[in-house]
A protein has these predicted regions:
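A hydrophobic transmembrane-helix motif
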Residues: 132, 176, 180-182, 248-290, ...
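Loop segments that connect adjacent transmembrane helices in multi-pass transporters
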Residues: 292, 296-347, 437
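Primarily ABC-family ATPase nucleotide-binding module
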Residues: 76, 80-84, 220, 224, ...
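Cytosolic ends of transmembrane helices, especially the final helix of ABC transmembrane type-1 domains
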Residues: 303-307, 322-326, 332, 369-370, ...
């Protein structure tokens, strides 16, 4: 089940400040801690890293050029003379000083912030390497444009020597470019993988803190966050991969724009200005369309997750569905979820087709523009043939850079939807119970005390629509055994939830031992995905020898389990291989191993026969544990001293066991 609240809010999603703030909140912690004014420091560090990479790229270019000239003087003089002259001119200018100062400042600031950066040194190093490789790839593209300019001029002049020399240069560039581009792609994927691991663990830390996983349960009618499992598994992966891909593409576009615009401007100023206007038009149209695409993509992510959840729900309840012969209704419900997702995807296809129509026309028309403008210059003899071909290459590169948003608006819209889903999820985990707290003004006060007592306790449902128990006062002495009875829906299980701190909506006081001294046993015990050993020691990570585990199993009449399932360290789907009665007995084995001061049981023996029930309660009595049971069976009276009866009108009565027997006789 998913909430209807969040999809309505999705219609307001835009490329706005909220989207930017959510992006920073998710992206920043991997590289720099969140905090007041720290975002400015983080963005400043990114800018400084970029400047430092530019400085490193400059010195590498100087070293390779001058070193190459020293080793191959004839080659560099004949074929790379303009490059050598350009480098020599730069060395005589202010550029070397600026590059050196930038590196010194970067090193100083990194030293000053070493406390926050040292544990993040790997990610900053990988990001710096990525930026440097991006500069290198862009430089390779610029070099190739010049090589083909000279190759085409040699062809036009019928100069075979120059042609073969520059073709040899091109081959050398390709030999160097292939491993560089491969390393660039590998580094990008590696950083995305490390980032995904860290960010997923970061979300999991928040998800399991403050019982967020319980408050944000998709089965709860009070949640505003649908399918948190998808947000942690899929949206985080998409965020890290797409963030790096898109931001590096933006950087590449900026570098391409700077590099090839300079080339294009020297060929034709009119071509350059016209290109800028054309790209601005395309970007504006793409942004307008992208606003609608954000909502559609957001809804699609949610609806696909709903469909998947429906299938998982069928798998988890297959036996119950089979007993009820509910296949037809289940298929109908799953089919309805599929139909809703298909309808939204159909709308997505329509918008994608409209955008494709614009993008195709936009891209195909641009192919003739450089020819229309540069051809007259070539026919008039104002430019050579190589320049003509270079103009076409430069025009295409600049247009691609300027049209990044236009050509990738569908991916950007999907990315924005993912940011909003993760951002809303992240914000809710700061206070997962906030929506419930807004609906009421009072909370149950819980304090740690040696024994359990309730004082004027009133328990409401989380949505405050119903009062379950009102003004309940009860003292449970160390020798007491309390049985809670009442009609279905009158609040028996809810009372245990309030004692456990899961439900806080209400009034009054609860005094109880520390939660680690209490063990709660639900009617359907939780079977984790693990070994038999892990099942027995759950929820604690305690070391117990096999003999102790075997003894605990024998006490609850499950002594055959280790031999039946290959020992204590094999993994099985325990929910499937054990009956509910066996699961309940295994839960009592956990009680024996953990030795809690209080055992709180919610119909914990409902699937057991009378004999096994007697064995388990006698075991609890031998442990001298205080226990509270919720149940309906008259046989439970034998093991309890007091009975708390809850009534549908939120009233209650406390009886001794004998008085309650007489009442129901």
């Amino acid at each position: 089940m998913t909430s209807t609240t969040e999809p309505k809010r999705a219609t307001r999603f835009r490329f706005d400040r909220q989207l930017w703030q959510r992006f920073i909140t998710i992206a920043q912690p991997y590289f720099y801690p969140l905090g007041h004014r720290r975002t400015g420091v983080y963005l400043g560090l990114l800018l400084l890293l970029l400047m430092a990479v530019v400085a490193v790229a400059f010195w590498l270019t100087v070293g390779l050029t001058l070193g190459g000239k020293a080793v191959f003087p004839a080659f560099f003089t004949n074929l790379a003379g303009p490059l050598v002259e350009r480098i020599t001119g730069l060395l005589a200018s202010w550029v070397p000083y600026a590059a050196s100062i930038t590196l010194a400042v970067a090193g100083f600031i990194a030293y000053r912030l070493r406390g926050a950066l040292w544990e993040r040194a790997v990610q900053w190093s990988l990001l710096g390497l990525l930026l440097l490789l991006s500069f290198t790839v862009n430089g390779i593209n610029v070099s190739i444009s010049y090589v083909f300019r000279f190759v085409n001029n040699a062809l036009n002049a019928e100069d075979p020597n120059t042609f073969w020399q520059y073709l040899f240069v091109y081959a050398g560039i390709i030999v160097a470019a292939v491993p560089i581009i491969t390393l660039y792609r590998y580094t990008r994927l590696k950083l995305a993988l490390r980032w995904r691991k860290w960010l997923t663990e970061h979300f999991l830390d928040r998800y399991f803190a403050n019982r967020s996983y319980y408050e944000l349960d998709s089965n709860s009618a009070n949640t505003e966050i649908d399918n948190p499992d998808q947000r942690v598994t899929q949206d985080v992966k998409s965020f890290t991969t797409v963030t790096l891909s898109f931001l590096l593409d933006v950087l590449d576009s900026v570098l391409t724009l700077i590099s090839f615009t300079a080339i294009l401007y020297t060929i034709s100023k009119a071509l350059t200005v016209g290109l800028l206007v054309y790209a601005l038009f395309g970007t504006t149209v793409a942004i307008i369309a992208g606003r609608q695409m954000i909502k559609i993509n957001y809804d699609q992510l949610r609806l696909e997750a709903d469909f998947r959840y429906g299938m998982v729900h069928v798998r988890n309840n297959a036996e119950s569905i089979a007993f009820y012969r509910g296949e037809g209704l289940e298929q109908q419900q799953v089919g309805q979820r599929l139909l809703t997702a298909i309808r939204n995807f159909d709308l997505l296809i329509i918008w994608q087709s409209l955008i494709d129509l614009f993008q195709l026309g936009y891209n195909y028309f641009t192919r003739i523009v450089p020819y229309m403008i540069v051809a007259p210059l070539y026919f008039a003899g104002d430019t050579d043939f190589g320049t003509f071909s270079q103009a076409a290459i430069a025009f295409g590169q600049v247009l691609t850079a300027l049209s990044l948003i236009t050509n990738r608006i569908e991916q950007i819209a999907e990315f924005a939807a993912s940011i909003n889903r993760l951002g809303a999820f992240y914000e809710r985990m700061d206070d997962p119970a906030a929506p419930q707290k807004r609906k009421h003004q009072h909370e149950i006060e819980t304090v740690v005390a040696p024994q359990l007592s309730l004082n004027n306790l009133t328990v409401f449902t989380p949505n405050s629509e119903q009062t379950l128990v009102e003004n309940l006062s009860l003292q449970i002495e160390p020798s007491d055994r309390l049985l809670v009875v009442g009609a279905s829906g009158c609040g028996k299980s809810s009372l245990l939830r309030a004692i456990a701190g899961l439900w806080t909506n209400g009034q009054g006081h609860i005094a109880r031992p520390d939660i680690n001294e209490m063990l709660f046993l639900p009617q359907r015990p939780y079977m984790l995905l693990g070994t038999l050993r892990e099942q027995l020691i759950y929820p604690y990570n305690i070391d117990r020898p096999d003999e102790t585990l075997t003894h605990a199993l024998k006490q609850v009449n499950l002594g055959e389990l280790p031999e039946r399932f290959g020992g204590f360290d094999t993994i099985h789907d325990w929910l499937s291989v054990l009956s509910l009665g066996q699961q309940q007995r295994l839960a009592f084995a956990r009680v024996m191993l953990s030795q809690p001061a209080y055992a709180m049981m919610d119909e914990a023996t409902s699937a057991l026969d009378i004999d096994n029930e007697r064995v388990l309660y006698n075991m609890l009595a031998d442990m001298k544990a205080v226990y509270v049971s919720v149940g309906h069976r008259p046989s439970l009276l034998e093991y309890h001293h007091k009975v708390l009866e809850l009534h549908p009108n939120s009233t209650w009565n406390v009886y001794s066991t004998e008085n309650y027997r007489q009442k129901i006789a």
